[in-house]
Design a protein with these regions (language model features):
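Short beta-strand scaffold positions
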Residues: 1, 29, 52, 115, ...
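Single conserved hydrophobic/aromatic residue that forms the stacking wall/gate
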Residues: 1-6, 10
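Alpha-helix C-terminal capping/helix-to-coil transition sites in glycosyltransferase folds
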Residues: 5, 22-23, 152-153
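Membrane-proximal helix-turn-helix segments that form the acceptor-binding/catalytic region
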Residues: 14-26
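A donor-sugar binding/catalytic signature common to diverse glycosyltransferases
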Residues: 27, 150-187
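Donor-nucleotide binding loops and adjacent catalytic segments primarily
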Residues: 67-153
Length: 239
């Protein structure tokens, strides 16, 4: 499941995904691009079955959309939802400083709500970040139902997460991705996601470009119709 969706083949988790693909009899792909990648890698000549089934994360998002709950904290009426936790950002003090300088400036315009990952908090403390003077609305990490509520009610998503890029799309929100690459290239190709790395000016400019942009095209369902799990089950029942 989630076969061929990778962004950097030198990362341990991506290597594990490739190895899992190699030993699998059925490869369930979430997107057209993932299916195309497998064919280009020669899987059409290997004794395996390739099935495009859609994304099981969208199944979950649609199922829980009406079951979400607001975090038990005071939140601004309009806000940007942000997460920062990837090692390439948190372990590089220069990247981390650039990202948070951009977020501080953005939060002057539209409050940035940021569930703070423990590793990110420790790294910020390590570079002398002054939380008492910050304009960002830091909150404790939230559960899935609270995150769904934040996704449904935010103006825009800013993240370095892989999954949150897709979840932003599921809930009709543009995403500013603070990474240099993404496994979800169809979101970039269709204009729903912008890669900005850790460039402060690019982060701020892309926020300004997308925060009030008309939300069009989200109905195209790049990841299926929310029935990926059923398609997987149907394929397995034919074995």
């Amino acid at each position: 499941v989630r076969s061929s969706a990778a962004s950097d083949v030198y990362k341990r988790q991506e290597i594990n995904r490739i190895l899992t693909d190699r030993i699998s009899d059925i490869l369930f792909c979430p997107t057209d691009k993932a299916t195309e990648n497998l064919v280009n890698e020669g899987y059409g000549n290997i004794r395996c079955q390739i099935v495009k089934n859609g994304d099981v994360m969208q199944d979950a998002a649609l199922f829980y959309a009406d079951k979400c709950r607001k975090p038990n904290i005071n939140l601004p009426e309009k806000f940007v939802l942000c997460t920062v936790h990837r090692a390439e950002n948190t372990d590089d003090s220069g990247r981390l400083k650039n990202i948070f300088m951009a977020l501080e400036n953005i939060s002057d315009k539209c409050k940035v709500v940021l569930p703070l990952h423990p590793r990110t908090k420790a790294k910020l403390i390590g570079i002398g970040y002054d939380f008492s003077c910050s304009n960002i609305c830091f909150i404790q990490p939230v559960g899935y139902l609270e995150m769904v509520w934040l996704l449904k009610n935010c103006e825009l998503v800013m993240t370095d997460s892989g999954g949150l890029q897709k979840e932003a799309y599921f809930f009709g929100k543009y995403c500013v991705t603070m990474r240099d690459e993404t496994e979800w290239v169809e979101l970039v190709d269709n204009g729903f996601n912008r890669l900005v790395g850790s460039n402060q000016a690019m982060i701020e400019d892309t926020y300004a470009l997308l925060v009030d942009a008309p939300k069009t095209g989200f109905e195209n369902r790049l990841y299926g119709n929310g029935d990926a799990g059923n398609k997987i089950l149907e394929s397995l029942q034919l074995l």
